[in-house]
A protein has these predicted regions:
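Cytosolic nucleotide-utilizing catalytic cores of signal-transduction proteins
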Residues: 1-160
Length: 160
């Protein structure tokens, strides 16, 4: 009988002596979490690949950081969970491609009109206006929601 297992690995920066082991462990743990949040699949990730997540993971975080953008993105994530849709992924790709309908539609393998319909639905659900809202705030909110999903409900992170 052949068993298949999915393995994720988080890599820290090089530790130079016992004094840096605790920091190295935290970096590796954060990189491991990054495989879930950034890649969405098991794999290998180095701490340096985390980008802005390095900073978000260092903040005290219990999901209680609330603002209108985070609440809006959380509504999209909840809608996706309940209906097995991918509106949050659509929003992420749209932001990643700096609002390009063509590039986002291509990345998602959908027709541009389908993308426009999804963006309208995102606006209806969340109250976000992607023509006016601060995209950086929306991007940070998306990352915070993804981190909370990866940490699981009710898990609390203390500052390190």
């Amino acid at each position: 009988e052949k068993l298949e297992a999915a393995v994720s690995i988080g890599l820290s920066n090089v530790c130079r002596g016992a004094a840096s082991f605790a920091a190295g462990f935290e970096e590796a743990r954060h990189a491991l979490l990054g495989t879930t949040v950034l890649k969405g699949t098991p794999g290998v990730m180095a701490y340096e690949e985390l980008g802005p997540y390095k900073y978000l993971l260092r903040m005290p975080f219990d999901g209680g950081v609330r603002d209108a953008h985070r609440d809006a993105v959380a509504r999209i994530a909840e809608y996706d969970r309940q209906r097995s849709t991918a509106l949050l992924r659509t929003l992420e790709e749209f932001l990643r491609r700096r609002g390009s309908i063509g590039a986002t539609a291509e990345a998602l393998y959908v027709h541009p009109n389908t993308l426009r319909q999804r963006l309208r639905r995102i606006g209806e659900l969340s109250g976000l206006d992607l023509r006016k809202d601060d995209w950086l705030m929306v991007e940070i909110a998306v990352k915070m929601v993804r981190l909370q999903e990866a940490l699981g409900p009710g898990e609390r992170r203390e500052p390190k």
